[in-house]
Amino acid sequence: MKYNIVFLFAIIASLACLQLTFAAPAASPLANPGASPDAAPNADPLADPFLPIIGKLLSGLLGKK
């Protein structure tokens, strides 16, 4: 069981590093006038595909269905 926790933290850390590596810098509203005003100012559209993967990894490591 203790190894599952180690792998969990390793996967989370590696995904965080991937996001920091490939994340685009937050654009200012002046640079993108067509941006939605409702969008979060620091939202990263490249991170959206990672969210379902993280959920599946966490549920698999924690033994949940």
Curated annotation (Swiss-Prot):
Signal peptide, first to last residue: 1-23
Proregion residues excised on maturation: 24-49
Ranges: AXPX repeats: 23-26, 27-30, 31-34, 35-38, 39-42, 43-46, 47-50
Residue(s) carrying Leucine amide: 62
GO cellular component: extracellular region
GO biological process assignments: defense response to bacterium; defense response to fungus; innate immune response; killing of cells of another organism
Protein name: Vespid chemotactic peptide VT1
